[in-house]
């Protein structure tokens, strides 16, 4: 019985000068020059490049020593990969697994490039199988994207994990993530929920790349359904506080009201990017009267109650801004109501937040601050809403503000504009009326 080929090949040892019948002279431009003792049988069978170089058809085959010394010139960065590839030619076979040939991503990439250059199909396959299966670091991923596309179709499996998926798959994962991001999972899953919210925002944001998901009608419908469910939870919390404002579980440290408010603040940002905030704003405006009444009856010395006020203001600031700058158009009466409800609430809450609120005396930790930009945005939004109201309503609001000694929010701009408009009103409107009469005569 004749020995199998791989058993015969086992008799050859890489670098064994005594049995070698060919030298691979490896050189680079930096002057490095190594003579590597090999065997023509191994090289010819495992590499088409060496098979061609050692064949009778090679142009220099009849030159003395040309068939006994093959010169390979390479870059310094690929030098060690060439040596490793020559070594692997002695061990690669169908019986040797990829994890015994490759030991890390960097080495596998380097050997893959050389194997492609020297036409070593078994080595190429082994490297591809290895790279397709192992995890990559971020830096390695960029290197893979640089090298693998040059290899050709045989290396395509490596890039399978980076390929874009069809929109139906994107939609499915977006909807699943959005449902989870607006749900109330156990506290232990809080980090996962936060991650879901971050990735949803990333998916629909246009940066250096186009958004992963286009907010078409199907997407908007799914999002609206999730927001409706979130409002149902919000109403349930509100009812519980209404019935038991002090003992209610929803305002203690393990309660859900603050979490719902945090979710609503996040949801509003997403709805803004998707240009579907109208339903949210209208619903918030409709429940504002009850919400203000319920929250104001909470004891302000309770830390959790102050945090609830903060969360309510964070959501309200976004709603007021949408109304103030015309993103959502509401009737005059509703806009006036929003100012009369939220202006005093915001004014009364600011001192509570600006004064340090401590969780306990032992750690003396300051909690529940509102970003200064939110106060400023609220102020600007209130001014915009007020200046769009009828003059008489403006006067009523400004009179009340001045009676409070000009406390926050600063409505000076609205006051100045009101004074100017009121003083010149007769002349301006008379001029308009005169122009109309002249035009009709």
Curated annotation (Swiss-Prot):
Disulphide bonds in the chain: none
One record GO biological process: protein ubiquitination
Protein's UniProt keywords contain Phosphoprotein: no
Pathway membership, UniProt: Protein modification; protein ubiquitination
Recorded domain comment: The BTB/POZ domain mediates the interaction with some component of ubiquitin ligase complexes.
Function, as annotated: May act as a substrate-specific adapter of an E3 ubiquitin-protein ligase complex (CUL3-RBX1-BTB) which mediates the ubiquitination and subsequent proteasomal degradation of target proteins.
Name under which the protein is recorded: BTB/POZ domain-containing protein At3g05675
Organism: Arabidopsis thaliana
């Amino acid at each position: 019985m004749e020995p199998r080929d791989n058993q015969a090949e086992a008799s050859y040892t890489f670098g064994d000068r005594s049995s070698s019948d060919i030298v691979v002279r490896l050189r680079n431009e930096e002057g490095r020059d190594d003579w590597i003792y090999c065997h023509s049988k191994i090289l010819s069978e495992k590499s088409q490049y060496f098979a061609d170089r050692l064949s009778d058809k090679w142009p220099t085959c009849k030159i003395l020593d040309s068939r006994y010394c093959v010169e390979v010139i390479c870059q310094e960065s690929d030098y060690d990969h060439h040596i490793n590839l020559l070594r692997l030619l002695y061990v690669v076979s169908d019986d040797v697994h990829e994890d015994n040939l490759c030991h890390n991503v960097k080495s596998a990439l380097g050997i893959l490039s050389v194997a492609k250059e020297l036409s070593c199909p078994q080595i190429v396959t082994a490297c591809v199988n290895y790279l397709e299966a192992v995890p990559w670091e971020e830096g390695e991923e960029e290197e893979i994207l640089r090298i693998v596309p040059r290899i050709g179709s045989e290396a395509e499996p490596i890039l399978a994990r980076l390929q874009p998926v069809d929109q139906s798959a994107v939609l499915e994962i977006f909807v699943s993530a959005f449902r989870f991001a607006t749900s109330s999972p156990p506290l232990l899953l809080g980090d996962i929920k936060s991650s879901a919210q971050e990735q949803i925002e990333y998916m629909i944001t246009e940066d250096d790349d186009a958004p992963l998901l286009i907010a078409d009608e199907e997407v908007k419908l799914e999002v609206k359904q999730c927001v409706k469910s979130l409002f149902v939870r919000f109403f349930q919390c509100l009812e519980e506080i209404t019935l038991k404002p002090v003992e209610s579980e929803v305002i203690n440290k393990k309660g859900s009201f603050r979490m719902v408010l945090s979710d609503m603040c996040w949801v509003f940002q997403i709805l803004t990017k998707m240009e579907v905030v109208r339903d949210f704003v209208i619903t918030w405006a409709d429940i504002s009267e009850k919400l203000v009444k319920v929250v104001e009856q909470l004891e302000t010395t309770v830390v959790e109650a102050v945090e609830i006020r903060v969360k309510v203001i964070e959501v309200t600031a976004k709603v007021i801004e949408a109304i103030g700058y015309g993103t959502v158009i509401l009737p005059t009466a509703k806009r006036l109501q929003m100012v009369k409800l939220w202006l005093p609430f915001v004014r009364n809450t600011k001192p509570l937040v600006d004064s340090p609120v401590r969780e306990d005396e032992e750690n003396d930790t300051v909690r529940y601050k509102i970003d200064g930009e939110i106060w400023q945005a609220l102020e600007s939004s209130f001014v915009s809403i007020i200046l769009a109201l009828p003059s008489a309503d403006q006067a009523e609001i400004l009179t009340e503000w001045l009676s409070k000694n000009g406390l926050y929010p600063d409505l000076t701009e609205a006051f100045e504009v009101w004074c100017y408009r009121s003083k010149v009103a007769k002349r301006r409107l008379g001029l308009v009326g005169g122009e109309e009469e002249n035009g009709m005569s």
